[in-house]
Amino acid sequence: MRAAALAHLSAGQREAAQRAALRRAAELGIGSLHECAGPAISSPEDLTALLALAEQEQGPEVFGYWGELGAVDTARRLGAVGAGGDLFVDGAIGSHTACLHSPYADSGRGGAEYLTAEQVADHVAACTEAGMQAGFHAIGDAALDAVVRGVRAVADRLGLAAVRALRHRVEHAELLDAAGIAAFAELGLTASVQPAFDAAWGGAEGMYATRLGAERARAMNPFAALLRAGVPLALGSDAPVTALDPWGTVRAAAFHRTPSTGSRSARPSPRTPGAAGGRWAGTTRAPGAGAPASYAVWAPAELLVQAPDQRVANWSTDPRSGVPGLPDLTPGGPLPQCLATVVRGRTVHMAG
């Protein structure tokens, strides 16, 4: 169905859609976008057209990923910064195609395995030797186990330091257990997560609970445990699966459907490393005195600080905490509005 739709999309229609997406991102205060392209999800022409458009027009920077097994040379030729993104180890919970160790509660099936641990290892080895970040789409616990086993095999072969240096990236990583989290930390993997998934489908009566049962669903998207283990989190939307919504994404991470699983630590600071969105450091322009800056100006309804004493509320207006004020993201309240977006010193959006 996707291939048929793309085949009927003209170059002009594609450019109009891409331009609209870039414009909307700028309006939302987004200065950097990651495009997860690949032969199974889009096309080389789609990726190169988007990268060219982003270079030509004032708007967010776009960093491309090409999700094709072993295609390091193709990724470089297309201008991608990584060989990964939508490189599918499994599918999705909703379609019963995320690969699980135990069957789905509502179907008895175990999901789909699109790549083996050996294929993961071959891809990660090729990327590591080429100095390029690798990445995979992996949601289910069996798929994540295949990723960990594959990456660990490369670490055994090429050395742990070489693997860790590239911060290979895993999209979604929703069903990680304690052993998987420890492995992510050990191997230097970045978890590219979508908190809006939990907001949309988590909870005792959500789609995840229907598919997996309440116990497994409660353990999904363990943001707090990942942060405690030192695993870098890149917060994203997987748009158009969920909408581009920066502060809504942060709110969903902070106010997880399973209270002990979310993390207020996921809130950004003025120099949030996660703002790089999981890019390998070799592709990130580090800020410095006199360098063109990228930032957004926000109008929050109220600024709060996080209380240092866990016996009181997590959110407080008490300035004695010593924590810089951040927007009140309490569910149900208004989110900050973007007044201006600046990308590398150029204003790309100014609210009217």
Where would I find each of the regions flagged by the language model?
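Non-cysteine beta-strand/loop elements that form the S-adenosyl-L-methionine
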Residues: 81-97, 189-199
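Active-site-proximal loop/turn and secondary-structure-junction residues that shape catalytic pockets
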Residues: 39-40, 68, 140-142, 174-176, ...
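Histidine/acidic-residue-rich catalytic or RNA/ligand-binding cores of hydrolases
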Residues: 45-47, 144-152, 201-208, 239-256, ...
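Long hydrophobic segments that form regular secondary structure
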Residues: 114-153, 272, 279-302
